[in-house]
Amino acid sequence: MDRINGLSDEIICHILSFLPTKESALTSVLSKRWRNLFALTPNLHLVDDDLEVGGCGQTLIDFVDRVLAVSSNLPIREFSIKC
């Protein structure tokens, strides 16, 4: 077992909470265990540049809707959008 997989889900989610939401979501491909961990983070940091559109637009709104749908039952501690 590698060291990161020895960490609890709570610790991994805490680490993921410091990443922009899109980068945090990209970790879901690492293994079955990681598939939904990004959705358990209490912070949502959305960056419009990651969505490859100019200015805040419909693509950002769609992404926010998808993220909120996945994490709908969890309290949100921080929510930020950078356009």
Swiss-Prot record:
Residues 4-37 form the F-box domain. SMART domains: FBOX (SM00256). CDD domains: F-box_AtFBL13-like (cd22160). It holds the Pfam family F-box. SUPFAM superfamilies: F-box domain. Gene3D superfamilies: 1.20.1280.50. This is F-box protein At1g19070. It comes from Arabidopsis thaliana.
